[in-house]
Amino acid sequence: MKPENFRADTKRPLTGEEYLKSLQDGREIYIYGERVKDVTTHPAFRNAAASVAQLYDALHNPELQNTLCWGTDTGSGGYTHKFFRVAKSADDLRQQRDAIAEWSRLSYGWMGRTPDYKAAFGGGLGANPGFYGQFEQNARDWYTRIQETGLYFNHAIVNPPIDRHKPADEVKDVYIKLEKETDAGIIVSGAKVVATNSALTHYNMIGFGSAQVMGENPDFALMFVAPMDAEGDKLISRASYELVAGATGSPYDYPLSSRFDENDAILVMDNVLIPWENVLIYRDFDRCRRWTMEGGFARMYPLQACVRLAVKLDFITALLKRSLECTGTLEFRGVQAELGEVVAWRNMFWALSDSMCAEATPWVNGAYLPDHAALQTYRVMAPMPYAKIKNIIERSVTSGLIYLPSSARDLNNPQINDTLAKYVRGSNGMDHVERIKILKLMWDAIGSEFGGCHELYEINYSGSQDEIRLQCLRQAQSSGNMDKMMAMVDRCLSEYDQNGWTVPHLHNNTDINMLDKLLK
């Protein structure tokens, strides 16, 4: 049963309840040595699933619809999240930015692979279906389905970290490849990583990242859509921070881990049949190599990613201020300066999102894309602040991060609660319950296993650090910006030589130079 068939009304996207039901499809998910029967009820996934369901419910909230939704452009007469429709102007992109931000605030910026992330893939299908050649109609059909239903896609485009120095066709026992072609579709086998939150998605887009060595065997040159319930398709999940939080603590102890854990997984495909209508690129290395930029996704997803990070930094900035109120150090000049630096990082990413929209450029078929220079700047800068901000928090909050009882249960023990009330209270009249609550939230954000995973996530979000810098350089060269910068330096160099100024408006110094006299 297709996910869209769970809708009671075909003129709207899924509701939260319908989304959860659509995940109960027998998908093959493994964690802790066992197969998961139902991701919507399993303690490793259920709160993350409920958090995604909250996003879908927001699309039907009358108070949020003006910010979140537009009418579809597919002829259905329905409505959808704004980022699921192709932008046709700079103002469209600005409205999409605001819709992305509104959705992201529901998870305080802590869920990055929400349905709007891969809506950028759907937008590329709709704006430039001709890129896919013989599979153009497939692109059009998927754009329609993704938009009208709000389908939740993820992608798995990175090969496992095994022999990455070799071309894909030399690691044929690991990397995803064509096994055979049939009338019904193609049969594929192999593995991809890192399938973040795929356990809670409807489909995975399988393809190539931009920096991978592809080789010459066209059996590896594939891009297709794989249903999460396809026979032979399995996910092997990493440890669940949500489950650990539930087993060892409470929401008071782990308020982020216990609901926003987007579980990463190894995606394994064992002779999976991919119907022809799900194929987008087939045995075509040239198109695979060109897809990153020409397919549109790489020009669209940075808007969602930048806004999501900006929302997250809003949260972290305010949480740092609240933590400093707990410790009584907020009035210290040096501490205020540190907080000011965090505010500056936050401001930068919001400013980049403004620039992406305000300087948007026309693309193909009337579509508009975020400004290329701004999005490439975001990709280079995004890994930088997180470790820096974490270090600022550690320096300014200091022992407050660990001067905490083990659990909310300690507050329910009358033998120690009075002691905690005296010695673990906050500053300026803040009681111990509030102080502990705030600082446990901060610890979950930066010090827990969940927090550590997010640091790794932000550092590597856009892929190879070298590659994103090279792409930023190539953009400067291809846009003409590098030529303009070089021309400015050349103009400066041309205004003087070893004999003095070469431009008429400046005075040479022969009348005041003292060197001849001094050297006699």
UniProtKB/Swiss-Prot annotation:
Its EC number is 1.14.14.9. The keyword Flavoprotein applies. GO terms for molecular function: 4-hydroxyphenylacetate 3-monooxygenase activity; flavin adenine dinucleotide binding; oxidoreductase activity, acting on the CH-CH group of donors. Pathway: Aromatic compound metabolism; 4-hydroxyphenylacetate degradation; pyruvate and succinate semialdehyde from 4-hydroxyphenylacetate: step 1/7. Induction: By 3- or 4-hydroxyphenylacetic acid. Keywords: Aromatic hydrocarbons catabolism, FAD, Flavoprotein, Monooxygenase, Oxidoreductase. SUPFAM superfamilies: Acyl-CoA dehydrogenase C-terminal domain-like, Acyl-CoA dehydrogenase NM domain-like. One of its GO terms (biological process) is phenylacetate catabolic process. InterPro entries: Acyl-CoA_Oxase/DH_mid-dom_sf, AcylCo_DH-like_C, AcylCoA_DH/oxidase_NM_dom_sf, HpaB/PvcC, HpaB/PvcC/4-BUDH, HpaB/PvcC/4-BUDH_C, HpaB/PvcC/4-BUDH_N, HpaB_gammaproteobact. It is an enzyme of class 1 (oxidoreductase). It catalyses: 4-hydroxyphenylacetate + FADH2 + O2 = 3,4-dihydroxyphenylacetate + FAD + H2O + H(+). Belongs to the FADH(2)-utilizing monooxygenase family. 4-HPA 3-monooxygenase consists of a reductase component HpaC and an oxygenase component HpaB. Utilizes FADH(2) supplied by HpaC or by another flavin reductase, to catalyze the hydroxylation of 4-hydroxyphenylacetic acid, leading to the production of 3,4-DHPA. NCBIfam families: HpaB-2. This is 4-hydroxyphenylacetate 3-monooxygenase oxygenase component.
